[in-house]
């Protein structure tokens, strides 16, 4: 029989891998955003997004942009595809984090 520690460790590994996938897709989106949507790139502080002095309110602006699916009106298919990927990976990572935390308290 599989122990609770093994299940929790496996959940933590899967969650970690998916969070890395999410951050990589987000970095790729910001790189593409520089050419595809320069105004949004400036609004979300594209150069300083992943720095320690990054402006949180500008980062929240990107979150709301993706959450409300404003990218559907954009003309660039690559940009909209990246936004969809980031949105999906964010939802997946958040759900996995919730399940992992729940499992940590139960097990």
From Swiss-Prot:
Instruction: Give the family this protein belongs to, as stated in its UniProt record.
Output: Belongs to the universal stress protein B family.
**Organism name:** Vibrio campbellii (strain ATCC BAA-1116)
Q: How does it sit in the membrane?
A: Multi-pass membrane protein
Kindly state one GO CC term assigned in the UniProt record. Answer: plasma membrane
What UniProt keywords apply to this chain's record, in alphabetical order? Cell inner membrane, Cell membrane, Membrane, Transmembrane, Transmembrane helix
Classification via HAMAP family: UspB
Where in or outside the cell is it found? Cell inner membrane
**Top-rank taxon, per record:** Bacteria
- List the lineage, top down: Bacteria, Pseudomonadati, Pseudomonadota, Gammaproteobacteria, Vibrionales
NCBIfam families in the cross-refs:
PRK04960.1 (NF003435)
Protein name in the entry: Universal stress protein B homolog
State where it is primarily located.
Answer: membrane
- GN (gene name): uspB
Segments spanning the bilayer are: 6-26, 86-106
In terms of InterPro entries, this protein maps to:
Universal_stress_protein_B (IPR019598)
């Amino acid at each position: 029989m599989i122990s609770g520690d093994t299940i929790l460790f496996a959940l933590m590994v899967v969650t970690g891998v998916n969070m890395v996938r999410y951050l990589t897709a987000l970095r790729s989106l910001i790189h593409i955003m520089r050419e595809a949507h320069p105004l949004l790139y400036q609004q979300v502080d594209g150069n300083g997004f992943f720095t320690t002095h990054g402006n949180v309110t500008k980062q929240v602006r990107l979150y709301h942009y993706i959450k409300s699916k404003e990218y559907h009106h954009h003309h660039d298919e690559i940009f909209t595809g990246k936004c969809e990927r980031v949105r999906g990976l964010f939802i997946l990572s958040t759900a996995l984090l919730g399940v992992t935390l729940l499992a940590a308290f139960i097990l």
